[in-house]
Amino acid sequence: MDLKDKLRHVMDFPKEGIDFIDITTVLQDPEAFRECMESFKTLAEKMGDFDLIVGSESRGFIFGAPLAYRMEKGFVPVRKKGKLPYKTVREEYDLEYGKDELEIHSDAIAPGEKVLIVDDLLATGGTTEANIKLVEKLGGEVTGIVYFIELMSLKGRDKLKGYNVDSIVKF
């Protein structure tokens, strides 16, 4: 199955000129979702050994949590500022028009733990860069980063040099 064919393109969303790639068409198709998760597992296995999977709010949760379950690893959510109930570590990152902040629980990753970052989309790499900084602030080691979709023209990998990066579908 070609998962690229299962994705829906929505023009001019969320603003004019954007070709939004909608993953819900894959999620609602059991066969496509299963294929997607098996592809994630294959990529994850190529990244070497790791202890935990980190996923960013919110679509990183969609793929990261089931992958962690499937691979018998822990899952660590990274959330937007103010959404986690315990002590956190925070990292600011750039958005197209401004800045935002991501947080992780301060005890989510032990020093030396190996981490795989999972997300739905690699565009500019800003969100992933913030995730990497959070993991490393806690003493974790990022062993790999895997995505469902990669937008090659935005050159997000440029911000991730030195890290093992792969994606299932490339546009």
Curated annotation (Swiss-Prot):
Cysteines paired by S-S bonds: none
Keyword hit for Glycosyltransferase: yes
Primary subcellular site in the record, as a coarse category: cytoplasm
PANTHER family xrefs: ADENINE PHOSPHORIBOSYLTRANSFERASE (PTHR32315:SF3)
EC primary class: transferase
Molecular function, one GO term: adenine binding
InterPro entries in the record: Ade_phspho_trans (IPR005764), PRibTrfase_dom (IPR000836), PRTase-like (IPR029057), UPRTase/APRTase (IPR050054)
Name the record gives this protein: Adenine phosphoribosyltransferase
Encoding gene per record: apt
Pathway this chain belongs to: Purine metabolism; AMP biosynthesis via salvage pathway; AMP from adenine: step 1/1
Main function: Catalyzes a salvage reaction resulting in the formation of AMP, that is energically less costly than de novo synthesis.
Pfam family, one: Pribosyltran
Localization: Cytoplasm
Keywords from the named record: Cytoplasm, Glycosyltransferase, Purine salvage, Transferase
HAMAP family linked to this entry: Aden_phosphoribosyltr
UniProt similarity note: Belongs to the purine/pyrimidine phosphoribosyltransferase family.
Alphabetical GO biological process terms: adenine salvage; AMP salvage; purine ribonucleoside salvage
Subunit organization: Homodimer.
Gene Ontology cellular component terms for the protein in this record: cytoplasm
Catalytic activity: AMP + diphosphate = 5-phospho-alpha-D-ribose 1-diphosphate + adenine
EC number: 2.4.2.7
NCBIfam families from the UniProt entry: apt, PRK02304.1-2, PRK02304.1-3, PRK02304.1-5
